[in-house]
């Protein structure tokens, strides 16, 4: 099962760009703090990273966040982006499974694993109303951000080619 830093390493570049663009525009303090933290970790001056062209800066951020040492940062960035930019996707998935959630699609405790068939019924409509690459990232993050995850979801993530995180 991929961990949050693995998800960053494997997600398609277009999704990485979406994520960092969202953070830069909507979560500027978090974005700048992330740059500062990662630059210091790599013994770089923050201004050196911050002044890079956006595309180059985002490639650098992805490479650094994708390292094992940055597992916590990767998990936090995924959570902020998914809840902030894709709450509808989260809600649609949980509604499809009949799981109660707040208006942002977050839950306090993970309920017992649904059947594989129930998961398929909840996931299938997501591909018609949401970016399929974002659906794949969300489901991998959903699985990775809980210590146990759901075995039935782990099987689907491994079997369904639409849910693969092949970075191009």
Predicted regions mapped to residue ranges:
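Acidic, low-complexity, intrinsically disordered interaction modules
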Residues: 25-152
């Amino acid at each position: 099962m991929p961990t949050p830093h693995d998800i960053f390493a494997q997600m398609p570049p277009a999704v990485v760009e979406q994520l960092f663009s969202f953070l830069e525009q909507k979560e500027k303090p978090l974005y700048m703090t992330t740059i500062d933290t990662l630059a210091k970790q790599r013994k770089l001056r923050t201004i050196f990273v911050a002044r890079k062209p956006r595309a180059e800066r985002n490639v650098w951020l992805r490479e650094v966040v994708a390292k094992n040492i940055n597992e916590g940062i990767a998990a936090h960035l995924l959570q902020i982006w998914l809840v902030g930019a894709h709450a509808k996707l989260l809600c649609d998935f949980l509604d499809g499974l009949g799981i109660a959630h707040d208006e942002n699609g977050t839950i306090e405790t993970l309920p017992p694993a649904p059947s594989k068939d129930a998961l398929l019924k909840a996931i299938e409509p997501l591909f018609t109303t949401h970016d399929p690459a974002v659906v794949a990232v969300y489901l991998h993050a959903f699985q990775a951000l809980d210590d146990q995850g759901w075995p039935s979801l782990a099987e689907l993530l491994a079997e369904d080619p639409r849910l693969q995180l092949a970075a191009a």
